[in-house]
A protein has these predicted regions:
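Rossmann-like dinucleotide-binding domain for NAD(H)/NADP(H)
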Residues: 59, 63-64, 149, 183, ...
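An N-terminal-biased, well-structured beta-alpha scaffold segment characteristic
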Residues: 1-64, 167, 187-189, 193
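Residue-level detector of alpha-helix initiation sites
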Residues: 26, 47-50, 69-70, 100, ...
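Phosphate-binding beta-alpha-beta segment of Rossmann-like dinucleotide-binding domains, i.e.
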Residues: 59-61, 66-115, 130, 134, ...
Length: 280
């Protein structure tokens, strides 16, 4: 039932054995407390912040997601956003639509040889690292958990703490969940340590970046630009970041490809089958 409301879920949830959701539906503790027959809650996507995982754990309900489905789609979006920031293609498009020809003004830069800092080297972060390495970018990585040595060797990863990564990178791409520990991970103080030409790309969760601090840093010229696919409040209609020429905004489309949607559905179906068979 794709259009089911929260009230309808509360009325019916006691009869569900398996709950499958995308990003629109939030599964709360109140719902889970009534889910007496539920064995699995499956998120067809990456983030699990719309599922109360602690409540599910307390009732021995398995919570699964399909990060494999979005891995390539999100990484490709980040790469496209970096290219657009580097060459100012979004600004050029807007200018032509407004009757302006900014050929001389839009002098870009190349990604080749630039330093890409990746915060969070899970499946998506690693996929991005491989794509960026193919463009001869230098990859700096930070994660709160150990980074796979095989991947590090493959892309020539330079491991660093967060402060060093921010100080050294020309582009910073964020791939972490939104937790208390990652809320405003990039705030005004962190941004002040970055290169004035550096650019931030966030396709993870909006609250990871302090949008007010980001706006001020870019407007004041202490940061080079940003591309955001996620926002602290969505839909982000009316965000003041839209005032800035060197900011690109997209409406949370990281996993919105035909291939990713199909793959995520297949991944979830296979995981559910394996759980029911006792394989995983």
């Amino acid at each position: 039932e794709p259009e089911i409301t929260s009230e309808q879920i509360l009325d019916k949830i006691s009869t569900f054995d398996i709950i499958i959701v995308r990003s629109r539906t939030t599964i709360t503790k109140e719902m889970i407390d009534k889910a007496d027959n539920c064995k699995i809650i499956a998120r067809v996507g990456v983030g699990l912040d719309n599922v109360d995982q602690e409540a599910a754990k307390a009732k021995n309900i398995r919570v699964i997601n399909a990060v494999e489905g979005a891995m390539n789609a999100v990484a490709e979006l980040v790469l496209g956003l970096m290219l657009s920031l580097a060459r100012q293609t979004a600004r050029g498009d807007r200018a032509i639509r407004n009757g302006e020809w900014l050929k001389k003004e839009l002098k870009g830069t190349e990604l080749r040889g630039k330093y890409l800092g990746i915060i969070g080297l899970g499946n998506i972060g690693k996929r991005l690292g491989r794509l960026a390495r193919a463009l001869n970018m230098n990859i700096i990585g930070y994660d709160g958990v150990p980074i796979e040595e095989e991947f590090s060797r493959e892309v020539g990863l330079m491991k660093a703490d967060l402060d060093t990564l921010l100080q050294s990178s020309d582009y910073v791409s964020i791939h972490v969940p939104l937790l208390d520990s990652t809320h405003h991970l990039l705030d005004a103080q962190k941004m002040s340590t970055m290169k004035k030409t550096a650019k931030i790309i966030n396709t993870s969760r909006g609250g990871v970046v302090d949008e007010d601090a980001l706006y001020n840093a870019i407007k004041n010229g202490t940061l080079g630009g940003a591309a955001l696919d996620v926002f602290e409040k969505e839909p982000a209609i009316g965000t003041k970041l839209a005032e800035l020429d060197n900011v690109i905004l997209t409406p949370h489309i990281g996993a919105q490809t035909k291939e990713a949607q199909s793959l995520a559905a297949n991944v979830i179906a296979e995981k559910i089958i394996q759980i029911l068979r006792g394989v995983i």
